Amino acid sequence: MNNLINDIKKELRANMNGVASAHARQTEDYRVNWGVELPRLANLADEIAENRFSSTPSEDISPRALAQALWNESTRECKILGCMLMPAEEMDEEVCDIWAESIRTEEIATMFCFYLVQKLPYASTKAFEWMAREEKMLQNCGYLTLCHLMRKYPLSEEAEAEFLDQAGASLDNRYAIKALQIYASLSEDNARKVKKVADYL
């Protein structure tokens, strides 16, 4: 596993974007950030999956184990690759919560929800659980996940009421605002409901 992780890091360094990396160091968002752009990371994730797991590997390393090992690294690119490579069907709820609770940056929260959480069979459950938490980053994950889900599936009447209640109490969170905007854009009736929430507040 260590050899594979080191090989991946070498490839990441070779694709380093110096300007983005320098900016990240100034903001101290990450312990290590090579500034590799997302399209290249997506291509690299495909290459890893094709080359490492397309045939019987020489080492007994599963995609899940590799994704977890990458997530454990204090490196922007490794964490994003971990989100891209984790098989959704193998991500149990307990591990999902552990990952979510360890997130420290909005970018990683965004990548986590986009590449992984929205694909999970319990994504809706997690979204509403996290929205109700006090921790800001978990709230972010909840609203980000719901943003993706609402574009694909209608909310039940009960879920709709809970969402409007939670989001209405979290208007200082820009992801709650984004979720309300997406919800309002889906129908005129939804837009009226969002307006009522805003007028009430």
Over which residues does each language-model region extend?
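Alpha-helical scaffold domains
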Residues: 1-201
